[in-house]
Amino acid sequence: ICERIGIKGSVITYQPTGGEKEVSNIDMPTHHEAIDAVIKALTNKETGVINDMSEVKAVGHRVVHGGEYFSKATLVDDDVIKKIEECNYLAPLHNPANIIGIKACMKLMPDTPNVVVFDTAFHQTMPESAYLYAIPRKYYDENKIRRYGFHGTSHSFVSKRVAEIMNKP
């Protein structure tokens, strides 16, 4: 985990498989340096878990809000980034940082596909009567304010796992 990106005292913390927790104070003025620090940790000759970045076949990003655009995992391209940016007003503390991280990964690993999953995607099948319940229609019409549902990646995993345990399709 990279913490304090863009401020003094930035640090990366990770624990190699079977090893001790590693904590390094590294100057990370932007997400670019933070992603670079992660790459160096992954490929470190002594504590890394991969030999080189050719072993990384894709990069996954969890994005908080996909608005009404996304209902499943999506391969990142310029149009996807634009649509995530259009949802920034719905998750102003999260989406902009997600975009910065996605762009940093794409720049540092230009030949590696990037995929996004959205916390709101799981709830996209909610009927209009449920997602507009108790919300004035004008808020939805003017600003797409509605119930979106959150933590969908967790809900998806748990519901699939419970179905598996209970032998239910």
Which residues does each PLM region occupy?
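Short, low-complexity, polar/charged sequence segments that are solvent-exposed and flexible
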Residues: G19-E22, E33, D78-I81, Y133-R137
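Short glycine/proline- and acidic residue-enriched helix-loop micro-motifs
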Residues: E22-S24, K83-N88, N143-I145
